[in-house]
Regions:
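Short beta-strand-to-loop elements that line the ligand-binding cleft
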Residues: 13-19, 99-108
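Beta-alpha-beta core module
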Residues: 45-51, 117-158
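Extended ligand-binding regions for polar small-molecule ligands
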Residues: 154-178
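Short beta-strand and adjacent tight-turn residues that come in two discontinuous sequence segments
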Residues: 19, 33-39, 107, 123-126, ...
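Hydrophobic residues within well-ordered alpha-helices
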Residues: 28-29, 89, 114-119
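Central regulatory/effector-binding core of bacterial HTH transcription factors
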Residues: 1-44
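Hydrophobic/proline-rich hinge and linker segments of small-molecule sensing/allosteric domains
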Residues: 38-81, 148-158
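Secondary-structure junction motif
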Residues: 74-96, 163
Length: 178
């Protein structure tokens, strides 16, 4: 994406900022960013300027041969308050009457997966993130069903022509029409 954009817009400086969806959305709203790729969850309504890039189910990541899954309260690795994946996991467990304990906090999914690999916790993450994780992580279907998560492209309220061009490159890479 960036290579194609750079070839067509060689004089444009691109600064990449990584962070959680809440922080990026706030930075976009405050005019600190021109464009953001954000995750949502639980079927939350999208903003008018959001463009859906990808939708996939959340799933439970567990240690393949671990004991953590059998323990109660169920030990969780989650992101901070406000993360839609965290909210989906806690709501599903609460609705199913499964007691839980937040054991590990990290806004980085790889850190959550490290807790799962060590059989210290389970985590609710996008299906593709679990499927692509190294062993001994697998997907568990004994825990309550989780909702879908979306990855969306959001631009500033009044995007520049360069921002529109980058957005078009991103949408094209995800096979989404402009």
């Amino acid at each position: 994406i960036l290579s194609r954009f750079s070839k067509a817009h060689a004089r444009v400086t691109v600064e990449i900022v990584s962070g959680d969806a809440q922080d990026l959305a706030l930075m976009l709203a405050n005019g600190e960013l021109d464009i953001a790729i954000l995750t949502t969850g639980g079927g939350a309504p999208l903003e008018e300027r959001d463009r859906l890039l990808l939708e996939q189910p959340l799933a439970w990541a567990v240690h393949k041969n671990g004991q953590c899954l059998k323990e109660r309260p169920l030990r969780l690795a989650v992101a901070r308050v406000g993360c839609p994946w965290r909210l989906a996991a806690l709501d599903a467990l609460k609705y199913a009457g499964i007691p839980y304990q937040i054991a590990y906090l990290s806004n980085v999914s790889e850190s959550q997966l490290a807790a799962v690999r060590a059989d210290l916790a389970v985590a609710a993450l996008p299906f593709s993130r679990i499927r692509n994780a190294s062993q001994p992580i697998c997907i568990n279907d004994e825990l309550p069903k989780l909702p879908y998560t979306q990855i969306v492209l959001r631009t500033a309220v009044n995007p520049s022509e360069n921002t529109k061009a980058l957005a078009a490159q991103i949408l094209s890479a995800f096979n989404r029409p402009e």
